């Protein structure tokens, strides 16, 4: 029982959602192009992606835990 609880708490293949960023900490602008965002997200190992209307930036779902997403900090590009 303890082993099962430990396995459930440790996330071996965690997934997260968010705005992926490039090496300059900048989000990917998409101009309402869902296909472009889907491609970016799949290349980063995500399950799906789309162009988020309000930010006009790509939003990914199911990204691996090691992929950087937009947090704090300014775009340096």
From Swiss-Prot:
Expression sites (tissue/organ): Expressed by the venom gland.
GO molecular function: sodium channel inhibitor activity; toxin activity
Residues in LCN-type CS-alpha/beta domain copies: 16-76
Keyword tags: Disulfide bond, Ion channel impairing toxin, Neurotoxin, Secreted, Signal, Toxin, Voltage-gated sodium channel impairing toxin
Places the protein is found: Secreted
GO annotation (BP), single: defense response
Position of the signal peptide: 1-7
Main location class: secreted
Disulfide bond residue pairs: 26-75, 30-51, 37-58, 41-60
Pfam families for the chain: Toxin_3
GO cellular component terms, A-Z: extracellular region
Family note: Belongs to the long (4 C-C) scorpion toxin superfamily. Sodium channel inhibitor family. Alpha subfamily.
Domain notes for this protein: Has the structural arrangement of an alpha-helix connected to antiparallel beta-sheets by disulfide bonds (CS-alpha/beta).
Protein name according to UniProt: Neurotoxin LmNaTx21.1
Species name: Lychas mucronatus (Chinese swimming scorpion)
